[in-house]
Amino acid sequence: MSTKQKHYLVGYGSLLSHDSRSRHSNIFCPNMPIVVNGWRREWLARGMAHLQTALGVSQVATASLNAVLLRIEQISPELRDREQDYQFIEVDPSTIVAAQESELAQAELANIRANPDTCKIFICVNLNKIQSNSQYPIYQTYIDTCLVGCFDMGVANFAAEFIQSTHFWEHGWINDRHNTLYAKPAMVTQQQQQQIDTLLKQQQVLEYRQEAGL
């Protein structure tokens, strides 16, 4: 029996987008939608190199977040570059369930639990926990990348649950769609942008967004 290590990554932000992760980080794998218990998603990951605030996570016993489980060959140089403001922390598989009983995710999680010595799941935990501001803003094109990834999951209300389970929308969010500032954006159509804005309005967070340059 092979003892080769199998690595998995919890993608809870821009890695939700198959387009973004394949083009910018060479991660090619199917979507396996999951829910991770005991972690809270937050706009608190200050990116020093790109002058932005991205998504990060904190351990909070009562919290949960929806995400995608990604099978990766290794924590590659491309992935480390993408996640340079984070550390890779191992996650207990018992805290993860398949989103809306996704058969693919269920089967993969069962295999992971059956092989704890060779199958390891990691989550990227941000090194800095600082709220966004005008110098380190939240980019709309980053949000678009996350939400088109949610749309691709094929799970009802996955995008709405992403918004609901994300904290600290209130500061430093700018609309950069006319001049993309996020370094690893997904391809997003105008129709998808409209869907995203409708969803953000329904979830009562769109009011916090400012136009770039204002």
Which positions does each model-derived feature cover?
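A glycine-rich, hydrophobic/aromatic-adjacent loop/helix-cap motif
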Residues: 2-214
